[in-house]
């Protein structure tokens, strides 16, 4: 069981009744708290939880409409996402209890200060390298709309400026990361047809491709509902249309692709996790048509080239700079 869940269960008497577990891990916590419900935005966690606790977990970027008498937020990595989620919960919990649990290395000690606008926060427990904090909501805020927290910015491309709109919690919120910048300089001569932007984030790659190659069918896929919501905002800001999917890795992508383009993730929360990218490299061939291309950017220190050659085809380094490489391989 996740150590954060173990800390909650040390104080199980506090978590009886109508409780909302927010950003909960895909473990057995709901089985230990039979009256609790969950809210998550990670498609993999949602699928795992729904398979075991069908109908007890809501998915998306907005707090569920179902009523709750207390809530526990599992601390996310991004401070601005924590602010949004705490606001959404506190606005519904006037006079009631709001809890925050997280790992010490995830910054729980500092994040606990984000409870102070709602009342006097106190630490209830410290164990398993985690902390549990609680506040009685004395000052319930007005709920802030998620769209009002969107952060638009412009990037200059060969065919003119592109507006990118990112939401709290999305990778490289409010700015273009170096890996995507290098990949955007190397999107020439892509195979025409169906193109997948894998791990689309705020949608910068998919939107740039759709505008540059308007006759291509562009699919944008991410495991995070805040990312796919951002991608939809980016498409709308540029008057573009594409299919946006929220799903867990390459298994959620369609078959018959001509191109897979990616700046793949390698973090889940505060933890390093290469599983989604390695799964992509192993299964890309199944999703590509013959002659289809996988093109991705990765940090220099990540040894993806042997995996690509083993599972996709001959791999070349198309470009490199700023600590990143562009890899390209075509399915025979």
Curated annotation (Swiss-Prot):
Record bears the keyword Repressor: no
Function recorded in the entry: Specifically methylates the guanine in position 1207 of 16S rRNA in the 30S particle.
Keywords for the protein's UniProt record, in alphabetical order: Cytoplasm, Methyltransferase, rRNA processing, S-adenosyl-L-methionine, Transferase
Organism (species): Pseudomonas syringae pv. syringae (strain B728a)
Catalysed reaction, written as an equation: guanosine(1207) in 16S rRNA + S-adenosyl-L-methionine = N(2)-methylguanosine(1207) in 16S rRNA + S-adenosyl-L-homocysteine + H(+)
Disulfide bonds: none
UniProt keyword rRNA processing, yes or no: yes
Subunit description: Monomer.
Pfam hit, one: MTS_N
EC number of the protein: 2.1.1.172
Gene Ontology CC terms: cytoplasm
Record protein name field: Ribosomal RNA small subunit methyltransferase C
GO MF terms held by the record: 16S rRNA (guanine(1207)-N(2))-methyltransferase activity
SUPFAM superfamilies referenced in this protein's UniProt entry, alphabetically: S-adenosyl-L-methionine-dependent methyltransferases (SSF53335)
Localisation: Cytoplasm
Domain of life: Bacteria
